[in-house]
């Protein structure tokens, strides 16, 4: 579809095809393309979240960058947990795993839950689940052996 839009705008053309040959074809099919674009526009608008603007674009970019940073942090924390187990790595893992899971499940909610009330209920449930997860991992780190030692004990079985 993007190639057709570029062809119609005159920004691209297939190799070896003169522009004069494309003009007649594009003029005949422009009404069909416009009608198809109009039919698909409501579907695109209803699937997205916030309207596209500079503010939402910047926030989305920052959120995406934060997700990648947490994923990269997890890649570094896993070997660190094996090589240097301790409370600092345990609590860092608790925070990073909870945040990574929260953002991942948030994307599942965004993709598969529709309607105002179900979205609010699902997001509230997600925040409760994330808070319980983080609290449980911190409790486990403080009162028990910690995440690193627990994984090492599982590996020794």
Curated annotation (Swiss-Prot):
One of its GO terms (molecular function) is metal ion binding. Residues 1-45 form a transit peptide. Gene3D superfamilies: Fumarate reductase/succinate dehydrogenase, transmembrane subunit. It is a multi-pass membrane protein. InterPro entries: CybS (IPR007992), SQR/QFR_C/D (IPR034804). The chain crosses the membrane at residues 62-83, 89-109, 119-140. Its main location: mitochondrion. A ubiquinone binds at residue 112. Belongs to the CybS family. Component of complex II composed of four subunits: the flavoprotein (FP) SDHA, iron-sulfur protein (IP) SDHB, and a cytochrome b560 composed of SDHC and SDHD. This is Succinate dehydrogenase [ubiquinone] cytochrome b small subunit, mitochondrial. It comes from Gallus gallus.
């Amino acid at each position: 579809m993007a190639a057709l839009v570029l062809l119609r705008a005159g920004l691209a053309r297939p190799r070896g095809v003169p522009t004069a040959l494309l003009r007649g074809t594009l003029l005949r099919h422009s009404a069909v393309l416009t009608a198809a674009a109009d039919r698909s526009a409501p579907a695109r608008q209803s699937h997205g979240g916030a309207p596209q603007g500079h503010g939402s674009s910047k926030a989305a970019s920052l959120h995406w960058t934060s997700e990648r940073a947490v994923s990269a942090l997890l890649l570094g924390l896993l070997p660190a947990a094996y090589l240097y187990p301790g409370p600092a790595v345990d609590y860092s893992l608790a925070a990073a795993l909870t945040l990574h899971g929260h953002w991942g499940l948030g994307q599942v909610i965004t993709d598969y839950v529709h309607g105002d009330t179900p979205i609010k209920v699902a997001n509230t449930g997600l925040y409760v689940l994330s808070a319980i997860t983080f609290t449980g991992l911190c409790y486990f780190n403080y009162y028990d052996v910690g995440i690193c030692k627990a994984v090492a004990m599982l590996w020794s079985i």
